[in-house]
């Protein structure tokens, strides 16, 4: 028998920015297969990730990423990347994402995410994709929204995710695990 401990995670919303109306896609994640970085191929986008991993995807996997501008990940530039107003759709379509810290960050900074179908599946959210074709369709769907519609979707998802914003509850859960 294996004991599995569910370690809770936590995100504190500090920016609470209004929705960004740019239709450019932003990607702030490692270049892991389950993060689906190949969805960016042919998409007007920015990627904030590791340069060497990016090169591998271009040279070994054959993706061009000709419409993607790469920014070398450095933690000190994280706020600057998310705070940009020239991208407003977050590539948050990560398969089997256990928590999704970067998804919370995108919401906090006013970016409307495209989610994988299995993430937060109990929340009804229309902008989900499983493959590249669906991902591209969701970019088009978001691009057609008015500012009010985008803001409403952002507010709804951000408000739902606030249940992970209670620091006292998070500390209590950790203490229960450590004291068990």
Predicted regions and their residues:
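Conserved donor-binding/catalytic core segment of Leloir-type glycosyltransferases
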Residues: 16-35, 44-46
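Nucleotide-sugar-dependent
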Residues: 89-103, 116-125
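Conserved active-site histidine-acidic residue motif and adjacent donor-binding/catalytic loop
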Residues: 54, 59-83, 96-97
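Short hydrophobic beta-strand element within catalytic cores of glycosyltransferases
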Residues: 108-116
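Short alpha-helical segment that forms part of, or immediately flanks, the ligand-binding pocket
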Residues: 79, 101-108
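A charged, aromatic-enriched C-terminal amphipathic alpha-helix characteristic of glycosyltransferases
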Residues: 133, 144-179
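Donor nucleotide-sugar binding/catalytic pocket of nucleotide-sugar-dependent glycosyltransferases
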Residues: 1-16
């Amino acid at each position: 028998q294996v004991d599995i401990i569910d370690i809770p995670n936590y995100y504190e919303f500090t920016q609470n920015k209004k929705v960004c109306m740019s239709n450019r896609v932003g990607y702030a994640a490692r270049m892991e297969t389950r993060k689906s970085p190949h969805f960016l191929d042919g998409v007007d986008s920015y990627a904030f990730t590791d340069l060497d991993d990016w090169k591998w995807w271009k040279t070994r996997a054959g993706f061009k990423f000709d419409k993607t501008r790469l920014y070398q990940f450095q933690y000190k530039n994280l706020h600057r990347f998310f705070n940009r107003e020239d991208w407003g759709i977050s590539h948050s379509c990560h398969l089997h994402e256990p928590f999704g810290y970067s998804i919370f960050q995108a919401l906090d900074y006013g970016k409307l995410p495209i989610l994988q179908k299995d993430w937060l599946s109990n929340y009804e959210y229309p902008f989900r994709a499983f493959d590249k074709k669906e991902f591209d369709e969701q970019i088009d769907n978001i691009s057609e929204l008015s500012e009010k519609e985008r803001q409403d979707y952002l507010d709804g998802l951000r408000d739902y995710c606030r249940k992970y914003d209670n620091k006292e509850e998070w500390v209590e859960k950790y203490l229960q695990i450590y004291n068990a």
